[in-house]
């Protein structure tokens, strides 16, 4: 067998060596994108859940089979979805307890009695009166363990609040009168200590009398509270004496006024007021007389005398009649003025209107 020569050894060394094996792949992190996207495949299978507890034992084998089928379906859903449905039941949710009595009121019950379930009702006076007593009674009535027939019957409504019905049936005038009576009783109680108990009782009967009086007091009542002026009636002898004194003196001194009041059995204030009124009347009379005189003088100044003139064609008519042979009457002027006529108005001064022909 021939030995390999040096050329064969050189060719063997010139051949490339095989590549080294690749390094092992790094261990995948559980937080890699692939694991996050396909996390359901690496999740361990869920543990079998015990069957749900039932409040009542199944009555028959069919009920037991139905419960087993429901448990199997629940396990299948948990395996497919990747989470346990029982964990949802362990979450704590807030409980909302709504009393059923607020939603169980029949419709006709609310329609027949709007006064007890609504704390503010319209009164005939036009204002809103709070009804705390009515609302409290309504709550007590709702909370009481009454049967359905008692709740639906309208008889408790008719007997519930007779006081409120009486208050609603009264007119605003009656309410105002009652309040004014209570205010008067309060004033009497303050004035007389012996009647303090009665006034306190009347005030307690109407606690909102003061507030009502502020709102219901009308402007028509205010003028009635003013003191009416008294009118003094003088006798004929007193008027005659006062008139004679006024003719002599328009103004009296304090001593003269005191003496006249003593002689006529009057007060000085009455005499003073009579003289003031008499002077005002006298001034009005003077003003009226002066105005009448001015009007008469102005009317007299405006009068203008207008003479009646003859017609200008009287001469032509006379000539025509003479040509016809008829006797011609001599026409005379209707009015003749020996002196020229002047205006009596002061603006027009000495303007002659007509001179004799």
UniProtKB/Swiss-Prot annotation:
Chief site of localization? nucleus
Disulfide bonds listed in the record: none
Listed GO cellular component terms? chromatin; nucleus
Where composition is biased (Low complexity), the residues are 191-209
Residue ranges, compositional bias (Basic and acidic residues): 130-140, 149-173, 210-223
Q: Which UniProt keywords apply?
A: Developmental protein, Differentiation, DNA-binding, Homeobox, Neurogenesis, Nucleus, Phosphoprotein, Transcription, Transcription regulation
Q: Where is the composition biased (Pro residues)?
A: 16-27
What GO MF terms are annotated? DNA-binding transcription factor activity, RNA polymerase II-specific; RNA polymerase II transcription regulatory region sequence-specific DNA binding
The record ties this protein, via InterPro entries, to: HD, HD_metazoa, HMX_Homeobox_TF, Homeobox_CS, Homeodomain-like_sf
CDD domains found in the cross-reference section? homeodomain
Spell out the residue ranges making up region: Disordered: 1-58, 129-229
Compartments, record wording: Nucleus
Q: Which domain of life is it from?
A: Eukaryota
Q: Which PROSITE patterns match?
A: HOMEOBOX_1, HOMEOBOX_2
* GO process terms (BP): brain development; cell differentiation; embryo implantation; inner ear morphogenesis; maternal process involved in female pregnancy; neuromuscular process controlling balance; regulation of transcription by RNA polymerase II
Phosphoserine carried by residues: 153, 180
- The record's DNA-binding region positions are 227-286
Family recorded in the similarity comment: Belongs to the HMX homeobox family.
The protein's job, in short, is: Transcription factor involved in specification of neuronal cell types and which is required for inner ear and hypothalamus development. Binds to the 5'-CAAGTG-3' core sequence. Controls semicircular canal formation in the inner ear. Also required for hypothalamic/pituitary axis of the CNS.
Name listed for the protein in its UniProt record? Homeobox protein HMX3
| Biological source species | Homo sapiens (Human)
Gene label: HMX3
């Amino acid at each position: 067998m021939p030995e390999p020569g040096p050329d064969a050894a050189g060719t063997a060394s010139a051949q490339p060596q095989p590549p080294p094996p690749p390094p092992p792949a790094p261990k995948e992190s559980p937080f890699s994108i692939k694991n996050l996207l396909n996390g359901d495949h690496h999740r361990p299978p869920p543990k079998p859940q015990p069957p749900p507890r039932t409040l009542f034992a199944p009555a028959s084998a069919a009920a037991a089979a139905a419960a087993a089928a429901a448990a199997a379906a629940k396990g299948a859903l948990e395996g497919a979805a990747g989470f346990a449905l029982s964990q949802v039941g362990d979450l704590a949710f807030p409980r909302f307890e709504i009393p059923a009595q607020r939603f169980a009121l029949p419709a006709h019950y609310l329609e027949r009695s709007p006064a007890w379930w609504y704390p503010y009702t319209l009164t005939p006076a036009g204002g809103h009166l709070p009804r705390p007593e009515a609302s409290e009674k309504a709550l007590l009535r709702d909370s009481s363990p009454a049967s359905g027939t008692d709740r639906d019957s309208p008889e408790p409504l008719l007997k519930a609040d007779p006081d409120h019905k009486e208050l609603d049936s009264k007119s605003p005038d009656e309410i105002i009168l009652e309040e004014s009576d209570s205010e008067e009783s309060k004033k009497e109680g303050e004035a007389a200590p012996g009647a303090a108990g009665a006034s306190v009782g009347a005030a307690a009967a109407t606690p909102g009398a003061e507030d009502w009086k502020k709102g219901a007091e009308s402007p028509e009542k205010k003028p009635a509270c003013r003191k009416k002026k008294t009118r003094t009636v003088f006798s004929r002898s007193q008027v005659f004496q006062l008139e004679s004194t006024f003719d002599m003196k328009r103004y009296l001194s304090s001593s003269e006024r005191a003496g006249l009041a003593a002689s006529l059995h009057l007060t000085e204030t009455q005499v003073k007021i009579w003289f003031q009124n008499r002077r005002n009347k006298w001034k009005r009379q003077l003003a009226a007389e002066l105005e009448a005189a001015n009007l008469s003088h102005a009317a007299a100044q405006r009068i203008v005398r207008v003479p009646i003139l003859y017609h200008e064609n009287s001469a032509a008519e006379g000539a025509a009649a003479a040509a016809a042979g008829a006797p011609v009457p001599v026409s005379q002027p209707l009015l003749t003025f020996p002196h020229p006529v002047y205006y009596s108005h002061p603006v027009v001064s000495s303007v002659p209107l007509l001179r004799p022909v």
